[in-house]
């Protein structure tokens, strides 16, 4: 059986004993070095998994007759001498063709946010005269993202519903949630896991805007930075401080050779050096993200959508990836192409608030700099002070904080006698205390990874019986 992966994979394939599987399988020997990387970042790199004898099929690779070969295509940077207006024209033709090919004749379910990716998709779907329903979800006690979703839906004349991520949903559904993504990323972060049963009640194909913000923006890096500086910038992007502390601690607990920091640097240097893009660190880091971050983190959590319905990700399209490689970084920076697309087709939508730059829109977001944005920041702070509570901005605040949540967290880490076969109670207690008594913001990632590791071990034990 021959199976080929696209430039950004749309499915996860596992390889074991020269066979390929399109569903979760387990290996026999744990890969503790790779698990440490996973703990520090929240996802695996390359083709690594929890096991030494289990790999995944890499991007642009083909599996045939027991062997994986590739890549058939490489990320590169070959900017053309072309005007911005012509680039936008090309984007319009390409993007709307992708949307038409994927959704023609289908009912579409479009999750909306206050950003640009779903807004851009909304216009492309409208231009193709497709049947669309929309929804937005937001944290209870958090900023009301549905406000922006409703503005966008109304401007496009789409029906819209609003849903709230509630405290403590995780504990009643943790087994199902952990099995859906195989524990390959921590499952507290993806809010869509809160709505598995709601998604089942919908009718249509999910149209997801993931990865538009990576393809159509950059980090604004200088072209003359060194390779070593690129590595350290990349390291700062993907490693979580609390996760690094946890990975470093368990590296020593597990008696692994050398030092975790050296191993991590070597891994990043190796992966980054395989991307043959010189003179454009923005392009190379975008390529790294698309080779590792997209398939090993983003794609894993899209399984929560795929659990109930077919999923399409237009920004994952091969032709769009190839297009990006020919666009000058100047045009890719600061979301210029998407902004111009929205302005051309829907000035009314462009006037709606861009959440990232609230209260500004696509015509005046340039004013979102100090001191021009100071009046709004003052008013917003006063509003939050009057509410007399911290605004919820991350899911762990709703799932880990509070008496009932804390008891559930404690029980899952200590009382179920699953995690201690991998991590000593002493180590779990250390990070539990760092989270509950020291710095919850820094150590929320570490505690979430321990919870995910516990569920992985639980599911592994069940699989072995």
Tell what function each PLM region has.
Residues 1-168, 172-173, 177-180, 451, ...:
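Cysteine-centered catalytic environments shared across enzyme families
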Residues 17, 229-234, 346, 439:
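Short, solvent-exposed helix-helix connector turns and helix-capping sites enriched
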Residues 23-27, 53-54, 58, 238-465:
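Adenosyl-5′-phosphate
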Residues 58, 86, 90, 94, ...:
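Generic recognition of stable, solvent-exposed alpha-helical segments in well-folded globular domains
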Residues 83, 87, 109, 137, ...:
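Conserved aromatic-histidine-acidic binding/catalytic patches
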Residues 105-109, 170-220, 253-311:
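Conserved adenosine/adenylate-binding substructure
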Residues 117-123, 213, 217, 321-323:
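General alpha-helical segment detector with a strong preference for membrane-spanning helices
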Residues 138-197, 210-234, 241-242, 277-278, ...:
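ATP-dependent adenylate-handling ligase core
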